[in-house]
Regions:
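Short alpha-helical transmembrane segments in multi-pass integral membrane proteins
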Residues: 1-47, 91-146, 214-282, 324-367
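Hydrophobic alpha-helical transmembrane segments of integral membrane proteins
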Residues: 70, 78, 95, 99, ...
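Transmembrane helix-bundle signature of multi-pass secondary active exporters and lipid flippases
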Residues: 47-51, 139, 146-217, 237-245, ...
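Short runs within selected transmembrane alpha-helices of multi-pass transporters and secretion channels
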Residues: 43-62, 70-78, 99-112, 204-207, ...
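Small-residue-rich hydrophobic transmembrane alpha-helices
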Residues: 1-12, 51-70, 186-246, 250-252, ...
Length: 367
């Protein structure tokens, strides 16, 4: 119930303050893309209640002993989105609206599957009284969720800073100050961030899968197993980062083509290649850092995890995004991520060593 209330409030906020929100994230009011942004945002805002409900129910379904159903419900929504996107955009000719509607319909599919499961839960049979809000429970939920909230909101703030710096310093660039090329920097970084998010989703999925195992073994006092799991997790995350790094550095043109931008101007292609190779050059460290954030939370160090995440996104991420362009222009925005990842890894490495020492029972070697 709390999720539905919050989602409706957020939907109203997005619909009422759509223009200021888009502007805050770097959209230019007078640009022809602004109308497309408004069109997309309108439909996405309408889908917020379905999206939030589906996402909120997913961990509940997993906790009820149905992880496969939880996965399939999300997968069904994603497949629906993938199938409907080209149909709505091209044969139907709906363009940007078609992409947004396809996304919302995918979210509705996930939400409907969640409702279906809610009526057939294994361990708990919800009654009408269970949907009432209780202050103590709401407070407890908000307390437990504040860590994830701060991490996500800091990431959003960092993304807003990146977009605004791209707009500001793109306007000062010899090429991108021209109207026909003005949208290239933001479009390119958007593609780079999509690729980055795909990789990070894999990283988060692997780390999140360790949480119940860590919780069980920590509760049983089997710290040696936790340490071994941490070692294997860091190794696997580093491998994922290395594969992503090879793709970004060695095959940027192919990645651009995958995202549907193969036939753009030479300025677009050149900047995209530079963006992939520069922005993602520390991908291995980015993956290890993300795994460290989640694992610290799993072993009960929620405060350390939150602080490390906020240092990465706010102090380093936003800080260098605002600072480096003053010296390097538009390229400074691209330098901000690798610099932030290196400095974050230095701090994370200290925490990793400390965590290993705390888990270093039975005389195992400290990393």
């Amino acid at each position: 119930m709390l999720t539905l209330i919050v989602s409706v409030v957020l939907m109203a906020v997005y619909l009422i303050f759509m223009d200021p929100i888009l502007t805050a994230f770097g959209a230019t009011v007078n640009a022809e893309t602004f109308a497309l942004s408004r069109e997309y945002c309108f439909w996405i805002a309408l889908g917020i209640p379905f999206y939030m409900f589906g996402q909120a129910m997913n961990p509940i379904i997993r906790s009820d002993g149905s992880p496969r159903y939880a996965m399939l419900s999300l997968l069904a929504g994603a497949v629906c989105n993938i199938i409907l996107d080209p149909i709505f955009i091209f044969p139907c000719g709906w363009g940007m609206m078609g992409a947004a509607v396809a996304t919302v319909l995918g979210q509705i599919v996930t939400a409907v599957l969640a409702v279906w499961y809610l009526c057939r839960m294994k361990t708990v049979k919800p009654g009408k009284g269970d949907f009432r809000l209780h202050a103590s429970l709401c407070t407890r939920m908000l307390t437990l969720g504040i860590t994830s909230f701060l991490s996500q909101i800091s990431l959003v703030a960092a993304m807003a800073a990146i977009n605004n710096m791209l707009r500001k310093y793109g306007a000062l660039d010899e090429i991108f100050s021209q109207e026909q090329y003005a949208q290239i920097p933001m479009a390119v970084v958007g593609i780079v961030m999509k690729f980055f998010q795909i990789v990070i989703s894999i990283v988060v999925g692997m780390a999140a899968g360790c949480i119940p195992v860590v919780g069980y073994n920590m509760g049983a006092g089997k710290k040696t197993r936790v340490r071994e799991l941490f070692t294997k997790l860091l190794l696997c995350e580093a491998i994922v980062g290395a594969v992503a790094l090879v793709l970004a550095e060695g095959f940027p043109r192919q990645l651009i083509a995958v995202f549907g931008a193969a036939n753009e101007s030479s300025y677009y292609t050149d900047f995209a290649i530079k963006a992939f190779r520069t922005y993602l050059c520390m991908m291995v460290l980015a993956c290890v850092n993300k795994a460290c954030f989640i694992f610290l939370q799993a072993v009960g160090k929620a405060f350390s995890s939150t602080m490390l995440s906020m240092i990465r996104e706010v102090v380093f991420g936003m800080g260098f995004t605002l600072l480096l362009p003053r010296f390097f222009g538009l390229d400074g925005v691209l330098y901000s991520m690798p610099v932030s990842d290196v400095l974050t890894f230095v701090i994370a490495a200290v925490m990793i060593v400390k965590t290993y020492r705390e888990l270093n029972t039975e005389g195992a070697t400290v990393l």
